[in-house]
Swiss-Prot record:
GO terms for cellular component: extracellular region. The keyword Zinc-finger does not apply. Binds 1 Ca(2+) ion per subunit. It catalyses: Eliminative cleavage of (1->4)-alpha-D-galacturonan to give oligosaccharides with 4-deoxy-alpha-D-galact-4-enuronosyl groups at their non-reducing ends. The gene is plyE. Coiled coil: none annotated. This is Probable pectate lyase E. Residues 1-17 form the signal peptide. Pectinolytic enzyme consist of four classes of enzymes: pectin lyase, polygalacturonase, pectin methylesterase and rhamnogalacturonase. Among pectinolytic enzymes, pectin lyase is the most important in depolymerization of pectin, since it cleaves internal glycosidic bonds of highly methylated pectins. Favors pectate, the anion, over pectin, the methyl ester. Pfam families: Pectate_lyase. It is found in: Secreted. GO terms for biological process: cell wall organization; pectin catabolic process. Its cofactor is Ca(2+). Residues 228-254 are annotated as: Disordered.
Length: 254
């Protein structure tokens, strides 16, 4: 006689339980997906391709036919593309078979460029100038350390960039032998599964302005005490919004 009474709570629980919503899983999958375009072919270079004007990659995948050496420091000779001052690279996919990705020797524009697997760095901004570097659209994933390494001076503008599974999206060089004041402006970023979005040297007057969304990113903006001694690692000063790190906390989830 007690069985109906025991079953009643179970029936009520089932009746009022939240039904399975298949769109929930789809939303999570969508959030975690990497929207890299389909490749239109592949090109392997035996040496870096130098660009002095505008190069449209036609959404082909470009590489060097070599195995990534991890965080072992490479150089310009290991890059896929080397951009001269004022050059533009657009509509290209950088494959996993490379070490240094893209080098800019001065101001440059990187538009709709995607890195399937970052090796040492995805994009290295070199030179001694104080111009503007623009990264528009595109994305990168699987960077053990940095995606964008800013060694030169000037401003970096990053718009509508997608980054996943990374150490840092942007890092102003912490121990270059010649230091500069550097500025980074990030808008429309979509970041997930990272250690830090931005690292700057506030003692040199660096500033970062950030907007967009971030999911599972431990720190958004980290300030360091930069040094010109390249045998010394820069010390971390602080993390979070400040006069140097300009953003509203928390950033929205992606």
């Amino acid at each position: 006689m007690y069985q109906p009474l025991l079953l009643l709570p179970l029936l009520l629980t089932s009746a009022f339980a939240t039904p399975h919503d298949p769109t929930t899983h789809q939303a999570l999958e969508k959030r975690a997906s990497f929207p890299i375009p389909s490749s239109k072919g592949s090109v392997t270079y035996s040496s870096p391709k130098t660009i002095s004007g505008t190069f449209d990659g036609g959404l082909k995948t470009y590489g060097r036919g070599v195995k990534c050496t991890g965080q072992k420091e490479g150089g310009e000779k290991d890059a896929v593309f080397v951009l001269e001052d004022g050059a533009t690279l657009k509509n290209a996919i950088i494959g996993a078979d490379q070490i240094e990705g893209v080098y800019c020797k001065g101001s440059c524009t990187i538009q709709n460029v995607w890195w399937t697997d970052v090796c040492e760095d995805a994009l290295s901004l070199k030179g001694t100038g104080s111009g503007t570097h623009r990264i528009i659209g595109g994305g990168a994933r699987n960077a053990d350390d940095k995606v964008i390494q800013h060694n030169s001076g000037g401003k970096v503008i990053i718009q509508d960039f997608t980054v996943q599974n990374f150490g840092k999206l942007y890092r102003a060089c912490g121990n270059c032998s010649k230091q500069f004041k550097r500025t980074v402006e990030i808008s429309g970023v979509k970041a997930s599964s990272g250690k830090a979005l931005v690292g700057i040297n506030s003692n040199y007057g660096d500033t970062a302005t950030i907007s967009g969304c971030a999911s599972s990113v431990k720190e958004i903006c980290v300030e360091y005490e930069g040094t010109d001694n390249n045998k010394k690692e820069p010390a971390k000063k602080s993390s979070g919004p400040s006069n140097a790190c300009k953003y509203k906390e928390p950033l929205a989830s992606c």
